Curated annotation (Swiss-Prot):
A motif ('HIGH' region) lies at residues 19-29. Zn(2+) binds at C108, C110, Y122, C126. One of its GO terms (molecular function) is zinc ion binding. It comes from Vibrio vulnificus (strain YJ016). This is Glutamyl-Q tRNA(Asp) synthetase. L-glutamate binds at R16, F17, A18, P19, S20, E52, Y177, R195. Pfam families: tRNA-synt_1c.
Length: 303
């Protein structure tokens, strides 16, 4: 359970877009932003923006401001204040302290080499050693082996992964993504998460965290991913090019086509607000590609 009470909002739709400031928004980021925006606005809901700046060594100076400027240039205006994870460490640490005190979490000093020798999954080696330093792991008492995706139906998580005591704070002192994102989504009242299919695997762990925190999990929708011409997922780690700030309408239309919209010819003459309004009105989950494979559509190097 939680060590303190979150201030929960009403159960009307609240979605979010949560980029990391490791570089500018690229075409793959635009797909995630648009998908989450259309899903929220088509249900007359709120669309929040959160900057997930948990990993300073990977961050690019000025990237957070550039991301927000890009969203504004594309007229993807968010509701409420932008939340920065770097300003919420107290929230994460309070929950970790609670779990350490209750015995639900423990310190671990196993190396990656040792875990590889265990078969690739951590086997709880340090659970009863009562260490006082190292990474912090959560005792997994509520493993999740499947969940329902709003477009793709039941998704399965490998049992070994679901049962693993995973890290909630790294040995270098940085907080783990899974813990931070769940605590933030609860705190912000998020009801549904729309994001790329590359985040399907951690979804099971995040749902486990909801249960262990005594909270009702959010709903999940995973979107198709864009690839570059070499067959790699468009990502900041793969040095994907930032999206063009001078022709946002054409980029929006390209991303909408990727998301399965049948774009009428007259929409190519519309302004940005008209395009987005049409997108909200015509957004349907069944238009999304069925395959969970990374798709090479629109991977011709334009983004």
């Amino acid at each position: 359970m939680l060590p303190f009470c979150f201030e929960m909002t009403s159960m009307s739709y609240i979605g979010r877009f949560a980029p990391s400031p490791s570089g500018p928004l690229h075409f793959g980021s635009l797909i995630a932003a648009l998908g989450s925006y259309f899903q929220a606005k088509s249900q007359h809901g709120q669309w929040l923006v959160r900057i997930e700046d948990l990993d300073p060594p990977r961050e690019m100076p000025g990237a957070a401001d550039l991301i927000l400027k890009t969203l504004e240039t594309y007229h993807l205006f968010w509701d409420g204040e932008v939340v920065y994870q770097s300003q919420r460490h107290h929230l994460y640490q309070a929950q970790i302290d609670h779990w350490l005190q209750s015995g639900q979490a423990y310190y671990c000093q196993c190396s990656r080499k040792q875990i590889k020798e265990m078969g690739g999954y951590y086997n709880g080696h340090c659970q009863e050693l009562h260490l006082d330093a190292g990474a912090i792991r959560l005792k997994m008492t509520q493993p999740i082996t499947h969940f329902d995706d709003l477009r793709h139906g039941q998704m399965h998580i490998p049992l070994e992964l679901a049962q693993e005591d995973f890290i909630i704070k790294r040995r270098d002192g940085l907080f783990a993504y899974n813990l931070a994102v769940v605590l933030d989504d609860i705190d912000q009242g998020v009801t549904e998460v729309v994001r790329g299919a590359d985040l399907i695997e951690p979804t099971g762990r995040q749902i486990s965290l909801y249960h262990m925190l005594g909270q009702v999990p959010v709903r999940y929708l995973h979107l198709p991913l864009a690839m570059d011409k070499n067959g790699n997922k468009l990502s900041k780690q793969n040095h994907a090019t930032g999206i063009d700030l001078t022709h946002p309408a054409s980029m929006i239309l390209e991303a909408m086509a990727f998301l399965g919209f049948a774009i009428p010819k007259e929409l190519h003459q519309a302004n940005l607000d008209e395009i987005l309004r049409w997108g909200v009105q015509n957004w349907r989950l069944n238009q999304l590609p069925e395959s969970l494979e990374i798709t090479a559509r629109f991977s011709n190097g334009t983004a």
